[in-house]
């Protein structure tokens, strides 16, 4: 009965199981123990039959599915992973080969280099777009107008022109644009502050482009640029101020030597006669009112007698005179006549007639007309000495001006005097400006007054009642509060004749005609 039952189970198992191998395995397992010994059929029949039945059912359900899943998973893995890896590697190799074939060179750092222009690109796509600039290829075309582009992004931005689409809109107003950077620039207009500030006039702007446009019109900025350029030129030519402070030797009780401010000026102008340089700027002692165009510097700076202040004042005056030269134009300046210097005299130095004065012991002349001055100039070709006797009382009343005015102005010679805080070392003839040096050929200066004899002729006060510095033109008798404007005005006077326009060469009869000519700007060039 047990054998039949077992056989019946076997037959049943054979009928139910889809494969015969599982049934045979079940039979073999029932006939053996884990120890390899044969168990009795009566003892192991029920337990082994139940276990084998359960295992056979589970294996019948799992094994076909697991094999199919394994096959499918293997097929899918091989079809997805391996082709992706192979395709990426092949694509990279193909791109590298194509780029190398087209002119791309792989660098050791992984970047690509164009063999046409040597441009280094970070990747193959960038190099591919760059190569189109050499080949002229534009694969992206607009269907509406036919415009072609090298990149797809440029085509998409171009299509927005036809559709009128403006996706970037301002949250504060109705402004809309097609590009993000344009919206970013527009949003700055709604900001409260103005970060872009002009350092020369103090104006502020919200955009840098507006500041750059302002600099093209900013007078202070343009003036500073010209002054810096002139200062760089003068730094190579102007000697230091210590060289200018030469002592004034006294020859004897009756003869004094007129000091020359900068001897290097003669050597400099000998090689360059067509240009006017600020070789001997005037120096002023006392409180000096300096006006700067920079907002970060106080407008009123009172400089004392320190040496640094004097050097700073001299440097600014050099720049101001060069600015006047730039304003007037170098082509309008007339060249000077330079005579060959002679040997040095025993008592005093001998210099060119273009920068010297002849002091006769018995008389002092003031040429009235240009003819007399020309005749006087012809007599000055020989050695010229700067030695002159000390002034007489009647000569002290003469005007220190070199204006070469007509005889009708002689009665106002007392008004021509200019006060320099009672310091005779600041006489205009000692600290000469370039205009005074050129005019010395046409006029003879009055002698220098003794210390303490000069008095303040005029005083200029501001709105607060404080006395301020003023500069007087000895030729036109005009006061200037700004030294730059004073220097520009002095540059309008001729070198030889103060009443001759230094711009166009027009010769005026008197100072009124000269002032009218300058104010009206009636310059005619022949």
Swiss-Prot record:
Keywords: Acetylation, Activator, DNA-binding, Hearing, Isopeptide bond, Metal-binding, Nucleus, Phosphoprotein, Repeat, Transcription, Transcription regulation, Ubl conjugation, Zinc, Zinc-finger. Residues 28-94, 368-435 are annotated as: Disordered. There is a cross-link at residues 95, 442, 448 (Glycyl lysine isopeptide (Lys-Gly) (interchain with G-Cter in SUMO2)). The modification N6-acetyllysine is found at residue 288. It is found in: Nucleus. Can form homodimers. Interacts with IKZF4 and IKZF5. This is Zinc finger protein Helios. It comes from Mus musculus (Mouse).
């Amino acid at each position: 009965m047990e054998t039949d039952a077992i056989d019946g189970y076997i037959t049943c198992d054979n009928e139910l199981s889809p494969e015969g191998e599982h049934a045979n395995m079940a039979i073999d397992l029932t006939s053996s123990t884990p120890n390899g010994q044969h168990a009795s059929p009566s003892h192991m029949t029920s337990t082994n039959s139940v276990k084998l039945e359960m295992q056979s059912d589970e294996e019948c359900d799992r094994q076909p599915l697991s094999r199919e899943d394994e096959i499918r998973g293997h097929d899918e893995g091989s079809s997805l992973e391996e082709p992706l890896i192979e395709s990426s590697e092949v694509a990279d190799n193909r791109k590298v080969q194509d780029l190398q074939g087209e002119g791309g060179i792989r660098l050791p750092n992984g970047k690509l280099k164009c063999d046409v222009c040597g441009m280094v690109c970070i990747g193959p796509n960038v190099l591919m777009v760059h190569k189109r600039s050499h080949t002229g290829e534009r694969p992206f075309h607009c269907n509406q107008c036919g415009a072609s582009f090298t990149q797809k992004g440029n085509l998409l931005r171009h299509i927005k022109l036809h559709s009128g689409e403006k996706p970037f809109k301002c949250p504060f107003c109705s402004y809309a644009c097609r590009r993000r950077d344009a919206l970013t620039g527009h949003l700055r207009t709604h900001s409260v502050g103005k970060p872009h500030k002009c350092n020369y006039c103090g104006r502020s702007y919200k955009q840098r482009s507006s500041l750059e446009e302002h600099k093209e019109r900013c007078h202070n900025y343009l003036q500073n640029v010209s002054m810096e350029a002139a200062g760089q030129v003068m730094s190579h030519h102007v000697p230091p101020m210590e060289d200018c402070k030469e002592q004034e030797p006294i020859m004897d009780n009756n003869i004094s030597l007129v000091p020359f401010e900068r001897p290097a000026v003669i050597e400099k102008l000998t090689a360059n006669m067509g240009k006017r340089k600020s070789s001997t700027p005037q120096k002023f002692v006392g409180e000096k009112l300096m006006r700067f165009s920079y907002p970060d510097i106080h407008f009123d700076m009172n400089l004392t007698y320190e040496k640094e202040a004097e050097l700073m004042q001299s440097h600014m005056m050099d720049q101001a005179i060069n600015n006047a030269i730039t304003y007037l134009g170098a082509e309008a300046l007339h060249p000077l006549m330079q005579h060959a210097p002679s040997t040095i005299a025993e008592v005093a130095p001998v210099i060119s007639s273009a920068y010297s004065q002849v002091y006769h012991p018995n008389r002092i002349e003031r040429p009235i007309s240009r003819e007399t001055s020309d005749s006087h100039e012809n007599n000055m070709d020989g050695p010229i000495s700067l030695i002159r006797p000390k002034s007489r009382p009647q000569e002290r009343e003469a005007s220190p001006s070199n204006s070469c005015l007509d005889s009708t102005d002689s009665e106002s010679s007392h008004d021509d005097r200019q006060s320099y805080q009672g310091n005779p070392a600041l006489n205009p003839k000692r600290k000469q400006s370039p205009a005074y040096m050129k005019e010395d050929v046409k006029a003879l200066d009055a002698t220098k007054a003794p210390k303490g004899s000069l008095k303040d002729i005029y005083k200029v006060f501001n709105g607060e009642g404080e006395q301020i510095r003023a500069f007087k033109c000895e030729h036109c008798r005009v006061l200037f509060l700004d030294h730059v404007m004073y220097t520009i005005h002095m540059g309008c006077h001729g070198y030889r004749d103060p009443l001759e326009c230094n711009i166009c060469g027009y010769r005026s009869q008197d100072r009124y005609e000269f002032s009218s000519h300058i104010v009206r700007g009636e310059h005619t060039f022949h």
